[in-house]
Amino acid sequence: MGKQCEVCGKKPQVGHHVSHSNIKTKRRFEPNLQSVRHQLPSGEVKTVTVCTRCLRSGAVTKPVVRKSA
């Protein structure tokens, strides 16, 4: 999948670079995406690409890491 959050669907937006002389050229604002391991309600662990807002809001639950003795 491209540069898109798998939870909220956030995608790149288009804007402009604006120079000192006010010349505008196109640019892209990319979302801050991170690949994290997500634990599904069934207990399955899957790697998903999510934006940092979804991570901070708790939309993604990380799996519990258990230390072996």
UniProtKB/Swiss-Prot annotation:
GO biological process, one term: translation
HAMAP family: Ribosomal_bL28 (MF_00373)
InterPro entries (alphabetical): Bacterial_rp_bL28, Ribosomal_bL28, Ribosomal_bL28/bL31-like_sf, Ribosomal_bL28_bact-type, Ribosomal_bL28_sf
GO CC term (a single one): ribonucleoprotein complex
Keyword Nucleotidyltransferase appears in the UniProt entry: no
Gene Ontology MF terms in the entry: structural constituent of ribosome
Pfam families linked to this entry: Ribosomal_L28
Ribosomal protein as UniProt keyword: yes
Sorted UniProt keywords: Ribonucleoprotein, Ribosomal protein
Record family assignment: Belongs to the bacterial ribosomal protein bL28 family.
Protein name, entry field: Large ribosomal subunit protein bL28
Highest rank taxon of the organism: Bacteria
